[in-house]
Amino acid sequence: MRMKLGILAGCVAMGVALSAPAQNVVITNARIIDGTGKVIEHGSVVAKDGRIVAVTAGGPTGSASGTHIDAHGMTVLAGYIDAHRHIFKGEANAWLHDQAARNMKSFVDAGFTTVFSMGDDPHGILELRRQLSSGAMVGPTLYAARIIPLSAPTPPPASAAPRGPYTDLARTDPARPPDRPETAPPAIPDEQTRAAVRAARQDGFDAIKTFMLTTPGGPEGHTLSVIVDEAHKQGLRVYTHATAVPDALAAVNAHIDVLAHTAHIGRLEENATAVKTLLDSHVPMVSTLAVFIPHFDADNKPLFRDGGPFPMPRPLSSGGQGPVNARILWDGGMNYAYGTDTQWDPHDSFTDELRALNLVFSPRDILKILGPNTAAAIGKSSELGTLEPGKRADLVIVDGNPLDDVFNLTRVALVVKDGKVVSDKRGKRRAPT
C-alpha cells in the first residue's frame, strides 16, 4: 500500500493526470458562440457525465450541478480541432519519456481538445494515444493516421545535390514545376497494398495517409484507388497529401475522404474545370496555409517550419496562392477545414494559421472552419465542432469576442475536456499576438 501511495503521490507531484470518469460542469454568465451560427450574449452551458445537456440563454435551468465556472462575460466555444499535425520530434522513445507530457498539455492550454496525427512514428504515436486515452497524461483526444506509399521507393539520382542541415521537403516541393518527376516509379503489387491497409487497421490506426505526386504513366492513381477500396472495407478513411492542383484532382478521382492540404501549386482562378471537379467530389480540404508564410521568432527572424531560415521566394508564392485557391473553393461550397501541419508550439501554430486564414476569411468564416467544418472533415460531427446537447463536453473559454477580433481565439482562459477542467489560465493569460 505504501508503494502504491508513493506512486500516486509522484504522479500528482509531476502533474500527471490519473484516469478519472467524465465530470459535470456548469458554465454561467458567458457569451456563447455555439458553432451553428447562433450567438447567445448572456447564457449558460451545462454538461453531465462528459456530455453537453443544455445550452441556454440566461442562467441554467433545472437542477444543474457540478463544477461551477463563472465566465464573467468571456466567450465559450467548442474545443478546437487540428486535423493535420505532426507531433514527435527526434527519437520516439526519448520524446515520449522527456517531452510528451509537456507537449500534450500545451495543446489543451492552446484550446485544442482534439488532434489528428497525419504521420508520426507508428509505434510511438499509438503508445501516446494509449497514454492519453487512459488518463496517464493531460492532453487532447488523439487520432492517428498510418502512411502507406503509392509506389515503390526509388533512389535519388546520382546528380542530386547533397542536402543541407534543413531537410524539410516542402522547402523544394517536388510537386512544384520544374521539379516534378518525369519518370514513373515502380508499382507496388495490389495485394501488398491491401495487406498494408489491413495491418494498419489491425494495429489500431484511425485512418490512412497517402502522398499523391502523379508521374507520366505512373501507378499512383491506381494504387490510391486500391487503398481507398480496402480502407473503406476496413472502416478507415483516407487522407491524401496533394499540394499541386493536378495531384488533388487525381486524389479526388480515386474517391479519397479528405485532402490533407490546400492545393497551393496551380492557379484555380485560371482553371474552372479543376474547380468544378474538386467541388463536385465533395471531398473536404484541410487548410495548412501557414506552412508557406514565415514564422517569426523572438528576434524577428523569418523561419520555416523546420526551424531554419524561411526559403524565399518559391514557397512564399504558395503563401499567396494557397489562400486564393482556398477562397475560390469556399465560395463554391467546399467543406474547408482547419489544420496546421507544423511542429511549432500549438499556440504559435494557431496564431500563424489564423494570420494566413485572415487574409481571405472573415472571423465568422474562420469559426465555421475551426468548428463544424473540421469536425465533419474528420468524421466526428456527431461528437465535436458545436455546442449542442449530446455532444462531447469539450469547451474553450476565451477572453474577448472572436467575432470582433479573430485573434481573441488565442486568448484561452480555460479549457474543459469531457466535462473536466484541463487548463485554467484565468489571471495569467498571454496578451493577444
Question: Which residue ranges define each predicted feature?
Answer:
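C-terminal cap of metal-dependent C-N hydrolases
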Residues: 30, 366-372, 376, 392-432
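Active-site gating loops and adjacent loop-to-helix segments of metal-dependent hydrolytic enzymes
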Residues: 105-110, 134, 138, 152-182, ...
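Active-site core of metal-dependent hydrolases
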Residues: 210-319, 344, 376-378, 396-399, ...
